[in-house]
Amino acid sequence: MEKAPAKINLSLDVLHKRDDGYHDVEMVMTTIDLSDRIELQQLPKDEIQIALESRYVPSDERNLAYQAAKLFKKTYQIPNGVRIQIEKNIPVSAGLAGGSTDAAAVLRGLNRLFHVNAPLKDLAKLGSNLGADVAFCVYGKTAIAKGFGDQIEMLPSPPNCWVITARPDIGVSTRTIFERIELQHLQHPDTKKVLEALQKRDFYQICISLGNALEDITFALHPEVNRIKNAMLQAGADGAMMSGSGPTVFGLVQHFSKAQRIYNSMRGFCEDVQLVRILG
């Protein structure tokens, strides 16, 4: 069994648009204790099976976990097939890298199942062909990702704290958000301050340095996401931000009693609210 933890962004910046149409990004990310679970079983025939109970997630080649298995098998010339059982706990299209972390878990799991023993850096390079968050998710923990998300540099973990996630009942297409980017109008986060705060393990400096260049775009399309962020701060979160392209908003709190109060308060705004520890 392979755990596939969700990620949150502590900083997300978009630097420029490349000739291939994609954007170069700079993202500081860490993992939280909200995880999908992946079980892998070797099959004698050359096939890939996906088993999961979710009407929102495809179980064919559109699934990133399927694509990860196909790429791994091709790269390392694996003749056998594999059955991938996915227990979904991370919301879909939520800005928490649910699909990417599943793909990363498949790469790690197949590496062990078939005794390939490839180093994580090789798996991360493979994963970068699947999506911008997959390389980070191969490593997990805390890191800064640059370029298309394929240049990974590990960072110190944030101090222990609680994370409240709140997600409205909408899905946000990352592609749609990136298509609406006007670089000259973006509010760029101070990534350097986030990095300095992580080096010092300064919780409150991390909280006041959070920044996401995509927030204003998502807020314009879905004002309820902005309302959730404001509600999170008004309820007492030390810091709050939208993760990824949204719509999930997270709040950071050091003490459980306060986190519990904020969790209960946010239940009045949306049904999908979680209270978890930071993993980092």
Curated annotation (Swiss-Prot):
**Single GO MF descriptor:** 4-(cytidine 5'-diphospho)-2-C-methyl-D-erythritol kinase activity
Please name one Pfam family that this protein belongs to. Answer: GHMP_kinases_N
User: What GO biological process, any one, is recorded here?
Assistant: isopentenyl diphosphate biosynthetic process, methylerythritol 4-phosphate pathway
Q: Where is the active site?
A: K7, D133
Listed A to Z, the keywords are: ATP-binding, Isoprene biosynthesis, Kinase, Nucleotide-binding, Transferase
Tell me which domain of life the UniProt entry assigns to the organism this sequence originates from: Bacteria
Q: What is its EC number?
A: 2.7.1.148
Please give the pathway this protein is involved in.
Isoprenoid biosynthesis; isopentenyl diphosphate biosynthesis via DXP pathway; isopentenyl diphosphate from 1-deoxy-D-xylulose 5-phosphate: step 3/6
Q: Where are the transmembrane segments?
A: none
The record lists the catalysed reaction(s) as:
4-CDP-2-C-methyl-D-erythritol + ATP = 4-CDP-2-C-methyl-D-erythritol 2-phosphate + ADP + H(+)
Role played: Catalyzes the phosphorylation of the position 2 hydroxy group of 4-diphosphocytidyl-2C-methyl-D-erythritol.
Alphabetized HAMAP family for the sequence: IspE
Family from the record:
Belongs to the GHMP kinase family. IspE subfamily.
Protein's name in the database: 4-diphosphocytidyl-2-C-methyl-D-erythritol kinase
Source species: Oceanobacillus iheyensis (strain DSM 14371 / CIP 107618 / JCM 11309 / KCTC 3954 / HTE831)
